[in-house]
Regions:
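Intrinsic-disorder/low-complexity coil detector
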Residues: 31-32, 211
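Short, positively charged and aromatic/hydrophobic N-terminal segments
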Residues: 6, 10-19, 29-30, 36-41
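Non-heme di-metal
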Residues: 44-223
């Protein structure tokens, strides 16, 4: 794995704030989570605040960046007729993704947090992106004469705002227990086989493909 980008302090700060839970100048639940880990000899040690914690964050950020970058490289290689090279880029990207997962789990007590926690973190991260990060990036780009880049920073920031709104809505559904049930009849669709059910709740099991309730979602006819 290699890193070809020159990463300055502003970029590193932005990445850390997005990934590790500092949003809108306030610490979210990830940053407050205790990160005690069990060592090979059975001792529990506090990871938070150590150099190793900082190294784990840097490793996660680097592996995540490499994963995304290698997927771009794979696509380009295949377009240029190098299918084997493209496949190897994709294989390596999968490796980097798994490396990133190892470090991410160490930073969160050894496991991926719950969906409710993840939705909160994701919403806070998107909020930081559109309220702070992209606004600051756009202002800097415009001051330096890069109007086209400033425009894109602003437009992507606007997209991140809709991402935050979506995560907040989904978080509310999880907290209120209405992901798979509503007060009125709704159209539920199995995302595996397409079976349709009308009612206040999604069935515990799809009667057609036997997939569990978790595969059902509210049908959205927007075409």
């Amino acid at each position: 794995m290699f890193y070809s980008l020159i990463i300055n302090d502003l970029y590193i700060n932005a990445v850390y704030r997005i990934i590790f839970g500092v949003a809108s100048k306030k610490m979210c639940i990830f940053a407050q989570t205790k990160t005690k880990i069990q060592t090979i000899n059975g001792l529990f040690m506090e990871l938070k605040g150590t150099k190793t914690e900082a190294n784990l964050k840097a490793a996660f950020a680097g592996e995540s960046q490499a994963h995304t970058k290698y997927l771009y490289y794979a696509s380009k290689a295949k377009k240029e007729g190098y299918v084997q090279i493209g496949n190897l880029f994709e294989e390596t990207a999968k490796n980097e993704k798994e490396h990133a997962k190892i470090w991410f789990k160490y930073l969160h007590g050894g496991e991926i947090p719950s969906t409710e926690v993840n939705l909160t973190d994701a919403a806070d991260g998107e909020n930081f992106e559109w309220t702070d990060m992209y606004a600051e990036f756009a202002a800097t780009a415009r001051e330096e004469g890069f109007a086209d880049i400033a425009f894109l920073f602003e437009k992507v920031g606007a997209i991140e705002k809709t991402h935050e709104e979506r995560y907040r809505k989904l978080l509310g559904n999880v907290k209120e227990g209405v992901v798979f049930s509503r007060d009125e009849d709704m159209i539920w669709e199995c995302s595996n086989c397409g079976h349709i059910v009308v009612g206040k709740k999604a069935p515990e099991l799809c009667p057609v493909c036997k997939h569990p309730k978790s595969y059902f979602m509210l049908r959205a006819d927007n075409y």
